[in-house]
Amino acid sequence: MNKQPEDWLDDVPENKNDDDDEIIWVSKSEIKRDAEALKDLGTELVDLGKNALERIPLDEDLLAAIELAQKIKKEGRRRQLQLIGKMLRARDVEPIQTALDKLKNRHNQQISLFHKLETLRDRLIAEGDEAIPTVLELYPDADRQQLRSLVRNAQKEQAANKPPKSFRQIFSYLRELAEKKQ
């Protein structure tokens, strides 16, 4: 029996749109980029200190490999980093990446807090007693008397061109208040 060109479609089974059977094609370049990203993540982990590593959810094998890479130099380190990248490919890296991002974010938040405290200190010295209620709103535990004394001393030092001792004391006092609040 000779089939017509349209008849060959009758022999092909219909696609039932099964998403489970669908094969997702990934290019070799994308696989390499993913592997390189995991290797970079491993490098970031190796560059962290011991205290920071304790805050990241790592299993014993991966932690041992990271600690070994921290001790190794030159070519051995490169090979160890490749091994760490390979180990990361076999694991769920999302919790590790999240913890690492939190560590980086904490550092950025601390820098941002210091900038805010410096601005507040400068405002206290420039405006004097008028800016103290702002500090008391932000930090209810603040001692008004001590703050007024520090501001007055800083203004006197600034007028006399003396070293900024009270200037630094205001900042450290504000930093203590911010740490208590957190």
Swiss-Prot record:
It comes from the Bacteria. This is Dual-action ribosomal maturation protein DarP. It is found in: Cytoplasm. Its main location: cytoplasm. Keywords: Cytoplasm, Ribosome biogenesis, RNA-binding, rRNA-binding. GO terms for molecular function: ribosome binding; rRNA binding. Pfam families: DarP (PF04751). GO terms for biological process: assembly of large subunit precursor of preribosome. Belongs to the DarP family. InterPro entries: DarP, DarP_sf. It comes from Yersinia pestis.
